[in-house]
Protein backbone atom coordinates (compact mmCIF):
# COMPACT_ATOMS: atom_id res chain seq x y z
CA UNK A 1 0.00 0.00 0.00
CA UNK A 2 1.03 3.59 -0.62
CA UNK A 3 2.03 5.30 2.62
CA UNK A 4 -0.66 7.05 4.62
CA UNK A 5 0.89 10.45 4.03
CA UNK A 6 0.24 10.08 0.33
CA UNK A 7 -3.21 8.60 0.85
CA UNK A 8 -4.24 11.64 2.88
CA UNK A 9 -3.61 13.77 -0.19
CA UNK A 10 -6.01 11.71 -2.29
CA UNK A 11 -9.70 12.28 -3.01
CA UNK A 12 -12.43 9.98 -4.17
CA UNK A 13 -13.43 9.98 -7.83
CA UNK A 14 -16.34 7.99 -9.25
CA UNK A 15 -16.12 4.81 -11.26
CA UNK A 16 -16.16 4.73 -15.05
CA UNK A 17 -17.48 1.29 -15.99
CA UNK A 18 -16.94 -0.44 -19.34
CA UNK A 19 -15.81 1.60 -22.33
CA UNK A 20 -14.24 1.60 -25.76
CA UNK A 21 -11.76 3.82 -27.54
CA UNK A 22 -13.65 6.33 -29.67
CA UNK A 23 -12.23 6.62 -33.18
CA UNK A 24 -13.79 8.47 -36.15
CA UNK A 25 -13.83 5.27 -38.21
CA UNK A 26 -16.15 3.53 -35.73
CA UNK A 27 -17.95 6.55 -34.27
CA UNK A 28 -21.40 5.55 -35.53
CA UNK A 29 -20.96 1.97 -34.32
CA UNK A 30 -19.84 3.11 -30.86
CA UNK A 31 -22.97 5.25 -30.52
CA UNK A 32 -25.14 2.20 -31.19
CA UNK A 33 -23.29 -0.22 -28.89
CA UNK A 34 -25.22 -1.27 -25.79
CA UNK A 35 -23.67 -0.96 -22.35
CA UNK A 36 -21.01 1.64 -23.18
CA UNK A 37 -20.47 3.71 -20.04
CA UNK A 38 -17.58 5.83 -21.31
CA UNK A 39 -15.21 6.40 -24.20
CA UNK A 40 -11.64 7.55 -24.57
CA UNK A 41 -10.59 9.89 -27.39
CA UNK A 42 -7.04 10.60 -28.56
CA UNK A 43 -6.54 14.14 -27.30
CA UNK A 44 -4.46 15.30 -30.27
CA UNK A 45 -7.25 14.27 -32.66
CA UNK A 46 -9.91 16.45 -31.01
CA UNK A 47 -10.35 20.18 -31.63
CA UNK A 48 -11.91 21.87 -28.57
CA UNK A 49 -13.75 24.43 -30.69
CA UNK A 50 -15.16 21.87 -33.12
CA UNK A 51 -15.94 18.71 -31.19
CA UNK A 52 -17.13 15.81 -33.35
CA UNK A 53 -20.91 15.50 -33.42
CA UNK A 54 -20.62 11.89 -32.31
CA UNK A 55 -18.82 12.88 -29.10
CA UNK A 56 -21.37 15.62 -28.45
CA UNK A 57 -24.21 13.10 -28.78
CA UNK A 58 -22.47 10.66 -26.46
CA UNK A 59 -21.92 13.38 -23.87
CA UNK A 60 -25.58 14.41 -24.11
CA UNK A 61 -26.51 10.81 -23.24
CA UNK A 62 -24.32 10.96 -20.14
CA UNK A 63 -21.41 8.99 -21.58
CA UNK A 64 -18.11 10.13 -20.04
CA UNK A 65 -15.36 11.16 -22.47
CA UNK A 66 -11.71 10.97 -21.37
CA UNK A 67 -8.96 12.62 -23.46
CA UNK A 68 -5.94 10.36 -23.88
CA UNK A 69 -2.72 12.19 -24.82
CA UNK A 70 0.09 10.65 -26.84
CA UNK A 71 2.53 13.51 -27.49
CA UNK A 72 3.41 15.07 -24.12
CA UNK A 73 6.48 12.88 -23.53
CA UNK A 74 6.38 12.95 -19.72
CA UNK A 75 9.26 10.47 -19.61
CA UNK A 76 11.48 12.66 -21.74
CA UNK A 77 14.43 14.63 -20.42
CA UNK A 78 12.86 18.01 -21.18
CA UNK A 79 10.17 19.58 -19.04
CA UNK A 80 6.67 19.27 -20.51
CA UNK A 81 5.91 21.83 -23.18
CA UNK A 82 3.55 24.51 -21.86
CA UNK A 83 1.68 24.69 -25.15
CA UNK A 84 1.01 20.95 -25.18
CA UNK A 85 -0.14 21.08 -21.57
CA UNK A 86 -2.48 23.97 -22.34
CA UNK A 87 -3.91 22.05 -25.30
CA UNK A 88 -4.55 18.99 -23.14
CA UNK A 89 -6.22 21.18 -20.51
CA UNK A 90 -8.47 22.76 -23.16
CA UNK A 91 -9.64 19.36 -24.32
CA UNK A 92 -10.41 18.21 -20.79
CA UNK A 93 -12.51 21.32 -20.22
CA UNK A 94 -14.28 21.14 -23.58
CA UNK A 95 -15.24 17.50 -22.97
CA UNK A 96 -16.17 17.97 -19.31
CA UNK A 97 -13.81 15.12 -18.49
CA UNK A 98 -13.21 13.86 -14.93
CA UNK A 99 -9.53 13.14 -15.69
CA UNK A 100 -6.95 13.08 -18.48
CA UNK A 101 -4.37 10.42 -19.27
CA UNK A 102 -0.90 10.28 -20.80
CA UNK A 103 1.99 7.83 -21.05
CA UNK A 104 5.17 7.03 -19.17
CA UNK A 105 7.29 7.37 -22.28
CA UNK A 106 9.54 9.64 -24.26
CA UNK A 107 8.59 10.64 -27.79
CA UNK A 108 11.38 13.04 -28.76
CA UNK A 109 15.02 13.63 -27.83
CA UNK A 110 17.90 15.94 -28.57
CA UNK A 111 17.64 19.71 -28.59
CA UNK A 112 19.14 22.19 -26.14
CA UNK A 113 20.03 19.68 -23.41
CA UNK A 114 22.29 17.78 -25.79
CA UNK A 115 23.20 20.56 -28.25
CA UNK A 116 21.99 18.28 -31.05
CA UNK A 117 19.07 18.32 -33.50
CA UNK A 118 15.67 17.60 -31.99
CA UNK A 119 14.40 14.22 -33.20
CA UNK A 120 10.82 12.94 -33.11
CA UNK A 121 10.17 9.24 -32.53
CA UNK A 122 6.60 9.24 -33.80
CA UNK A 123 5.91 6.58 -31.19
CA UNK A 124 6.00 5.89 -27.45
CA UNK A 125 9.45 4.71 -26.35
CA UNK A 126 10.29 3.20 -22.95
CA UNK A 127 11.90 5.16 -20.15
CA UNK A 128 14.88 3.53 -18.40
CA UNK A 129 13.88 2.36 -14.93
CA UNK A 130 16.65 4.25 -13.20
CA UNK A 131 16.71 6.77 -10.37
CA UNK A 132 17.67 9.54 -12.78
CA UNK A 133 14.70 8.78 -15.02
CA UNK A 134 12.38 8.52 -12.01
CA UNK A 135 13.54 11.89 -10.65
CA UNK A 136 12.88 13.54 -14.01
CA UNK A 137 9.54 11.80 -14.50
CA UNK A 138 8.33 12.81 -11.03
CA UNK A 139 9.11 16.46 -11.66
CA UNK A 140 7.47 16.34 -15.09
CA UNK A 141 4.35 14.76 -13.62
CA UNK A 142 4.15 17.46 -10.95
CA UNK A 143 4.46 20.15 -13.61
CA UNK A 144 1.61 18.54 -15.55
CA UNK A 145 -0.53 18.20 -12.43
CA UNK A 146 -0.10 21.91 -11.72
CA UNK A 147 -1.11 22.87 -15.27
CA UNK A 148 -4.13 20.61 -15.75
CA UNK A 149 -7.64 21.42 -14.46
CA UNK A 150 -8.42 17.75 -13.77
CA UNK A 151 -6.53 14.79 -12.29
CA UNK A 152 -3.86 13.05 -14.35
CA UNK A 153 -3.33 9.31 -14.80
CA UNK A 154 -0.29 7.86 -16.56
CA UNK A 155 -0.03 4.62 -18.53
CA UNK A 156 2.60 1.88 -18.60
CA UNK A 157 3.69 1.30 -22.19
CA UNK A 158 4.57 -1.69 -24.34
CA UNK A 159 8.24 -2.09 -25.19
CA UNK A 160 10.17 -3.95 -27.87
CA UNK A 161 13.52 -3.11 -26.27
CA UNK A 162 15.13 -3.06 -22.83
CA UNK A 163 17.49 -0.46 -21.42
CA UNK A 164 20.80 -1.75 -20.03
CA UNK A 165 21.56 -1.05 -16.38
CA UNK A 166 18.01 -0.70 -15.12
CA UNK A 167 17.73 -0.35 -11.34
CA UNK A 168 14.06 -1.18 -10.72
CA UNK A 169 11.30 -3.44 -11.93
CA UNK A 170 8.27 -1.87 -13.59
CA UNK A 171 6.19 -2.40 -10.45
CA UNK A 172 8.78 -0.76 -8.22
CA UNK A 173 9.16 2.15 -10.64
CA UNK A 174 5.41 2.77 -10.72
CA UNK A 175 5.08 2.37 -6.95
CA UNK A 176 7.72 5.02 -6.30
CA UNK A 177 6.17 7.32 -8.91
CA UNK A 178 2.79 7.15 -7.17
CA UNK A 179 4.32 7.55 -3.72
CA UNK A 180 6.25 10.68 -4.74
CA UNK A 181 3.58 12.40 -6.86
CA UNK A 182 0.23 10.86 -5.98
CA UNK A 183 -0.46 10.45 -9.71
CA UNK A 184 -3.07 7.90 -10.81
CA UNK A 185 -2.20 4.86 -12.92
CA UNK A 186 -3.72 3.69 -16.18
CA UNK A 187 -2.69 0.05 -16.31
CA UNK A 188 -2.61 -1.52 -19.77
CA UNK A 189 -2.75 -5.28 -19.30
CA UNK A 190 -1.95 -5.80 -23.00
CA UNK A 191 1.30 -3.92 -22.42
CA UNK A 192 2.11 -6.18 -19.47
CA UNK A 193 1.67 -9.12 -21.86
CA UNK A 194 3.89 -7.40 -24.44
CA UNK A 195 6.64 -6.90 -21.88
CA UNK A 196 6.29 -10.54 -20.82
CA UNK A 197 6.93 -11.77 -24.37
CA UNK A 198 9.54 -9.18 -25.37
CA UNK A 199 11.39 -8.60 -22.11
CA UNK A 200 10.70 -11.74 -20.08
CA UNK A 201 8.89 -9.81 -17.34
CA UNK A 202 6.33 -11.64 -15.20
CA UNK A 203 2.91 -9.90 -15.30
CA UNK A 204 1.92 -11.40 -11.94
CA UNK A 205 5.06 -10.00 -10.31
CA UNK A 206 4.34 -6.58 -11.79
CA UNK A 207 0.80 -6.71 -10.38
CA UNK A 208 2.18 -7.83 -7.00
CA UNK A 209 4.31 -4.68 -6.83
CA UNK A 210 1.75 -2.19 -8.12
CA UNK A 211 -0.09 0.20 -5.78
CA UNK A 212 -3.50 -1.07 -6.91
CA UNK A 213 -5.32 1.65 -4.97
CA UNK A 214 -3.86 4.15 -7.46
CA UNK A 215 -5.43 2.51 -10.54
CA UNK A 216 -7.73 4.91 -12.41
CA UNK A 217 -8.71 2.43 -15.12
CA UNK A 218 -7.44 -0.41 -17.30
CA UNK A 219 -6.71 -0.79 -21.02
CA UNK A 220 -7.27 -4.03 -22.93
CA UNK A 221 -6.03 -4.47 -26.52
CA UNK A 222 -4.84 -6.99 -29.08
CA UNK A 223 -1.64 -7.52 -31.00
CA UNK A 224 0.32 -10.19 -32.84
CA UNK A 225 3.53 -12.16 -32.52
CA UNK A 226 6.14 -12.34 -35.27
CA UNK A 227 9.52 -14.05 -34.96
CA UNK A 228 9.24 -14.19 -31.19
CA UNK A 229 8.41 -10.48 -30.85
CA UNK A 230 4.99 -9.27 -29.70
CA UNK A 231 3.70 -6.18 -31.48
CA UNK A 232 1.08 -4.18 -29.58
CA UNK A 233 -0.79 -3.31 -32.76
CA UNK A 234 -4.26 -2.38 -31.45
CA UNK A 235 -5.37 -3.85 -34.77
CA UNK A 236 -6.07 -7.45 -33.79
CA UNK A 237 -8.46 -9.30 -31.46
CA UNK A 238 -7.68 -9.43 -27.75
CA UNK A 239 -5.86 -12.74 -27.09
CA UNK A 240 -6.59 -15.00 -24.14
CA UNK A 241 -3.28 -14.26 -22.34
CA UNK A 242 -4.28 -10.58 -22.11
CA UNK A 243 -7.68 -11.54 -20.67
CA UNK A 244 -5.88 -13.80 -18.19
CA UNK A 245 -3.81 -10.84 -16.95
CA UNK A 246 -7.00 -8.79 -16.67
CA UNK A 247 -8.52 -11.59 -14.57
CA UNK A 248 -5.45 -11.62 -12.32
CA UNK A 249 -5.68 -7.87 -11.81
CA UNK A 250 -9.43 -8.03 -11.18
CA UNK A 251 -8.95 -10.76 -8.58
CA UNK A 252 -6.81 -8.33 -6.58
CA UNK A 253 -8.93 -5.19 -6.87
CA UNK A 254 -12.03 -3.85 -8.57
CA UNK A 255 -10.95 -1.88 -11.64
CA UNK A 256 -12.86 1.42 -11.62
CA UNK A 257 -13.02 1.26 -15.40
CA UNK A 258 -11.96 -1.05 -18.22
CA UNK A 259 -11.61 0.09 -21.83
CA UNK A 260 -11.16 -1.81 -25.11
CA UNK A 261 -8.67 -0.18 -27.51
CA UNK A 262 -8.78 -0.66 -31.27
CA UNK A 263 -6.94 1.74 -33.59
CA UNK A 264 -6.63 -0.04 -36.93
CA UNK A 265 -8.15 -2.82 -39.02
CA UNK A 266 -11.60 -2.25 -37.53
CA UNK A 267 -13.87 -5.31 -37.59
CA UNK A 268 -17.64 -5.40 -37.79
CA UNK A 269 -19.33 -3.82 -34.75
CA UNK A 270 -20.56 -7.22 -33.65
CA UNK A 271 -16.99 -8.44 -33.17
CA UNK A 272 -16.14 -5.44 -30.99
CA UNK A 273 -19.28 -6.08 -28.95
CA UNK A 274 -18.22 -9.70 -28.47
CA UNK A 275 -14.81 -8.54 -27.25
CA UNK A 276 -16.49 -6.20 -24.78
CA UNK A 277 -18.62 -9.13 -23.66
CA UNK A 278 -15.50 -11.24 -23.09
CA UNK A 279 -14.04 -8.44 -20.97
CA UNK A 280 -17.19 -8.23 -18.84
CA UNK A 281 -17.26 -12.01 -18.45
CA UNK A 282 -13.61 -12.02 -17.38
CA UNK A 283 -14.32 -9.41 -14.72
CA UNK A 284 -17.34 -11.29 -13.43
CA UNK A 285 -15.41 -14.55 -13.22
CA UNK A 286 -12.75 -12.77 -11.20
CA UNK A 287 -15.40 -11.81 -8.67
CA UNK A 288 -15.65 -8.17 -9.66
CA UNK A 289 -18.11 -5.99 -11.50
CA UNK A 290 -16.67 -3.37 -13.87
CA UNK A 291 -19.67 -1.11 -13.54
CA UNK A 292 -19.93 -1.18 -9.76
CA UNK A 293 -20.59 2.19 -8.13
CA UNK A 294 -18.07 3.76 -5.78
CA UNK A 295 -20.62 3.55 -2.99
CA UNK A 296 -20.61 -0.23 -3.16
CA UNK A 297 -17.11 -0.44 -1.76
CA UNK A 298 -17.00 -1.44 1.91
CA UNK A 299 -15.79 1.11 4.41
CA UNK A 300 -13.49 -1.45 6.03
CA UNK A 301 -11.57 -2.32 2.86
CA UNK A 302 -10.02 0.24 0.57
CA UNK A 303 -10.24 -0.93 -3.03
CA UNK A 304 -9.49 0.68 -6.32
CA UNK A 305 -13.22 1.27 -6.81
CA UNK A 306 -12.72 4.10 -4.33
CA UNK A 307 -10.88 5.91 -7.10
CA UNK A 308 -8.58 8.48 -5.55
CA UNK A 309 -6.83 11.41 -7.07
CA UNK A 310 -3.63 13.13 -6.02
CA UNK A 311 -3.75 16.74 -4.99
CA UNK A 312 0.02 17.11 -4.67
CA UNK A 313 1.70 19.18 -7.41
CA UNK A 314 5.12 20.40 -8.38
CA UNK A 315 5.13 22.97 -5.55
CA UNK A 316 3.86 20.87 -2.70
CA UNK A 317 0.24 20.07 -1.95
CA UNK A 318 -1.53 22.71 -4.00
CA UNK A 319 -4.99 21.25 -4.48
CA UNK A 320 -5.92 20.95 -8.13
CA UNK A 321 -9.61 21.38 -8.93
CA UNK A 322 -11.68 18.49 -10.18
CA UNK A 323 -13.94 18.93 -13.13
CA UNK A 324 -16.76 16.79 -14.43
CA UNK A 325 -20.41 16.97 -15.31
CA UNK A 326 -22.78 19.48 -13.73
CA UNK A 327 -20.68 19.75 -10.58
CA UNK A 328 -17.63 21.03 -12.42
CA UNK A 329 -16.10 24.14 -10.94
CA UNK A 330 -13.87 26.74 -12.54
CA UNK A 331 -10.18 26.02 -12.13
CA UNK A 332 -8.10 28.61 -10.29
CA UNK A 333 -5.89 29.24 -13.28
CA UNK A 334 -3.70 31.79 -11.51
CA UNK A 335 -2.62 29.29 -8.87
CA UNK A 336 -1.99 26.65 -11.50
CA UNK A 337 0.09 29.05 -13.58
CA UNK A 338 2.21 30.00 -10.57
CA UNK A 339 2.78 26.33 -9.78
CA UNK A 340 3.78 25.57 -13.36
CA UNK A 341 6.14 28.54 -13.46
CA UNK A 342 7.81 27.54 -10.21
CA UNK A 343 8.26 23.95 -11.35
CA UNK A 344 9.52 24.96 -14.77
CA UNK A 345 12.28 27.15 -13.34
CA UNK A 346 13.43 24.77 -10.61
CA UNK A 347 16.79 23.07 -11.24
CA UNK A 348 17.32 20.21 -8.72
CA UNK A 349 16.94 17.55 -11.40
CA UNK A 350 19.05 19.31 -14.06
CA UNK A 351 22.08 16.96 -13.79
CA UNK A 352 19.71 13.99 -14.00
CA UNK A 353 17.95 15.61 -16.95
CA UNK A 354 21.21 16.04 -18.83
CA UNK A 355 22.29 12.44 -18.25
CA UNK A 356 18.87 11.20 -19.32
CA UNK A 357 18.86 13.52 -22.33
CA UNK A 358 22.17 12.16 -23.62
CA UNK A 359 21.03 8.56 -23.19
CA UNK A 360 17.66 9.10 -24.87
CA UNK A 361 19.17 11.10 -27.74
CA UNK A 362 21.72 8.36 -28.42
CA UNK A 363 19.02 5.70 -28.49
CA UNK A 364 16.58 7.65 -30.65
CA UNK A 365 19.32 8.66 -33.08
CA UNK A 366 20.24 5.00 -33.51
CA UNK A 367 16.59 4.15 -34.15
CA UNK A 368 15.68 6.88 -36.63
CA UNK A 369 18.95 8.30 -38.00
CA UNK A 370 21.13 5.23 -38.38
CA UNK A 371 23.81 6.25 -35.87
CA UNK A 372 25.70 3.52 -33.94
CA UNK A 373 23.76 1.45 -31.42
CA UNK A 374 24.55 2.62 -27.85
CA UNK A 375 26.49 0.17 -25.71
CA UNK A 376 24.48 -2.48 -23.91
CA UNK A 377 21.46 -2.55 -26.22
CA UNK A 378 20.36 -5.60 -28.18
CA UNK A 379 21.19 -4.75 -31.80
CA UNK A 380 18.66 -7.18 -33.23
CA UNK A 381 15.84 -5.78 -31.11
CA UNK A 382 16.83 -2.23 -31.99
CA UNK A 383 16.56 -3.22 -35.64
CA UNK A 384 13.05 -4.54 -35.02
CA UNK A 385 12.13 -1.31 -33.23
CA UNK A 386 13.62 0.86 -35.99
CA UNK A 387 11.63 -0.96 -38.67
CA UNK A 388 8.47 -0.69 -36.58
CA UNK A 389 8.99 3.06 -36.17
CA UNK A 390 9.49 3.52 -39.91
CA UNK A 391 6.39 1.44 -40.71
CA UNK A 392 4.24 3.40 -38.28
CA UNK A 393 5.61 6.66 -39.66
CA UNK A 394 4.63 5.58 -43.17
CA UNK A 395 1.13 4.70 -41.97
CA UNK A 396 0.59 8.03 -40.20
CA UNK A 397 1.97 10.10 -43.09
CA UNK A 398 -0.46 8.27 -45.37
CA UNK A 399 -3.30 9.35 -43.07
CA UNK A 400 -2.32 13.01 -42.69
CA UNK A 401 -1.46 13.30 -46.40
CA UNK A 402 -3.70 10.74 -48.16
CA UNK A 403 -2.85 12.28 -51.53
CA UNK A 404 0.66 10.80 -51.36
CA UNK A 405 -0.33 7.10 -51.53
CA UNK A 406 -2.94 8.07 -54.10
CA UNK A 407 -0.37 9.79 -56.32
CA UNK A 408 2.44 7.28 -55.79
CA UNK A 409 0.23 4.17 -55.70
CA UNK A 410 2.20 0.99 -54.98
CA UNK A 411 5.45 2.99 -54.99
CA UNK A 412 4.47 4.94 -51.84
CA UNK A 413 5.30 2.48 -49.10
CA UNK A 414 8.64 1.10 -50.38
CA UNK A 415 9.73 4.64 -51.26
CA UNK A 416 8.91 5.93 -47.79
CA UNK A 417 10.56 2.99 -46.01
CA UNK A 418 13.70 3.62 -48.06
CA UNK A 419 13.56 7.35 -47.28
CA UNK A 420 12.87 7.11 -43.53
CA UNK A 421 16.17 5.68 -42.15
CA UNK A 422 18.28 8.54 -43.47
CA UNK A 423 15.75 11.29 -42.85
CA UNK A 424 14.57 11.44 -39.22
CA UNK A 425 11.37 13.29 -38.43
CA UNK A 426 12.04 16.67 -36.82
CA UNK A 427 8.83 18.66 -37.16
CA UNK A 428 5.73 16.49 -37.00
CA UNK A 429 3.94 14.35 -39.56
CA UNK A 430 2.72 17.13 -41.87
CA UNK A 431 6.25 18.48 -42.18
CA UNK A 432 7.43 14.90 -42.68
CA UNK A 433 5.03 14.43 -45.59
CA UNK A 434 6.29 17.62 -47.25
CA UNK A 435 9.93 16.66 -46.75
CA UNK A 436 9.30 13.21 -48.23
CA UNK A 437 7.63 14.69 -51.31
CA UNK A 438 10.46 17.21 -51.71
CA UNK A 439 13.00 14.39 -51.47
CA UNK A 440 11.29 12.47 -54.26
CA UNK A 441 11.01 15.52 -56.51
CA UNK A 442 14.68 16.39 -56.10
CA UNK A 443 15.53 12.84 -57.14
CA UNK A 444 13.36 13.15 -60.26
CA UNK A 445 10.75 10.77 -58.95
CA UNK A 446 8.31 9.30 -59.52
CA UNK A 447 9.37 8.26 -63.01
CA UNK A 448 5.87 8.63 -64.41
CA UNK A 449 5.63 12.23 -65.67
CA UNK A 450 1.96 12.68 -64.77
CA UNK A 451 2.48 11.36 -61.23
CA UNK A 452 5.52 13.62 -60.85
CA UNK A 453 3.49 16.63 -61.98
CA UNK A 454 0.73 15.85 -59.50
CA UNK A 455 3.25 15.39 -56.69
CA UNK A 456 4.94 18.69 -57.58
CA UNK A 457 1.59 20.52 -57.57
CA UNK A 458 0.67 18.97 -54.22
CA UNK A 459 4.00 19.99 -52.70
CA UNK A 460 3.82 23.55 -54.07
CA UNK A 461 0.33 24.08 -52.65
CA UNK A 462 1.43 23.11 -49.14
CA UNK A 463 5.11 23.88 -48.77
CA UNK A 464 5.00 27.51 -47.68
CA UNK A 465 3.03 30.06 -45.65
CA UNK A 466 2.19 32.06 -48.79
CA UNK A 467 -0.09 31.06 -51.68
CA UNK A 468 1.57 29.20 -54.57
CA UNK A 469 3.59 31.38 -56.92
CA UNK A 470 2.40 32.10 -60.44
CA UNK A 471 5.75 30.65 -61.47
CA UNK A 472 5.86 27.21 -59.81
CA UNK A 473 9.00 26.16 -61.66
CA UNK A 474 10.90 29.11 -60.21
CA UNK A 475 9.56 28.36 -56.76
CA UNK A 476 10.63 24.73 -56.98
CA UNK A 477 14.07 25.84 -58.17
CA UNK A 478 14.44 28.15 -55.16
CA UNK A 479 13.36 25.36 -52.81
CA UNK A 480 15.83 23.00 -54.46
CA UNK A 481 18.61 25.50 -53.91
CA UNK A 482 17.68 25.83 -50.21
CA UNK A 483 17.81 22.06 -49.78
CA UNK A 484 21.16 21.76 -51.55
CA UNK A 485 22.65 24.53 -49.41
CA UNK A 486 21.66 22.62 -46.27
CA UNK A 487 23.70 19.59 -47.34
From Swiss-Prot:
InterPro entries reported in the protein's UniProt record: MbnB/TglH/ChrH, Xyl_isomerase-like_sf
Region span, Disordered: 319-348
Annotated spans, Unknown: 286-487
Biased composition (Low complexity): 326-348
Region described as UPF0276: spans on this chain: 1-285
Annotated signal peptide: none
A Pfam family: MbnB_TglH_ChrH
Similarity remark: In the N-terminal section; belongs to the UPF0276 family.
Name of the protein described by the UniProt record: UPF0276 protein SAV_2218
Organism: Streptomyces avermitilis (strain ATCC 31267 / DSM 46492 / JCM 5070 / NBRC 14893 / NCIMB 12804 / NRRL 8165 / MA-4680)
Lineage of the organism: Bacteria, Bacillati, Actinomycetota, Actinomycetes, Kitasatosporales
Amino acid sequence: MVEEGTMERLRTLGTLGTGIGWRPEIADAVERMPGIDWVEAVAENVCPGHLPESLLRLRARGVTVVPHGVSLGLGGADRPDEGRLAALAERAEALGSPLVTEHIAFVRAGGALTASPLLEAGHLLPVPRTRDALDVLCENVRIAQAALPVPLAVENIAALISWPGEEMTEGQFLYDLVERTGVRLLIDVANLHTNHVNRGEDPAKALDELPVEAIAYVHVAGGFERDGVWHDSHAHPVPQPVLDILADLASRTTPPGVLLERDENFPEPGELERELGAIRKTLEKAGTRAGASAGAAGAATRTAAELTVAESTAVGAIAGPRRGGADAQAAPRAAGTEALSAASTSTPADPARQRLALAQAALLSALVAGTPVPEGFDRVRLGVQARALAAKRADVVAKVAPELPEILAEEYRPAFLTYAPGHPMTGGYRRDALDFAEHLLLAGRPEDAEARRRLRDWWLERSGPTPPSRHPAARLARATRRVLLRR
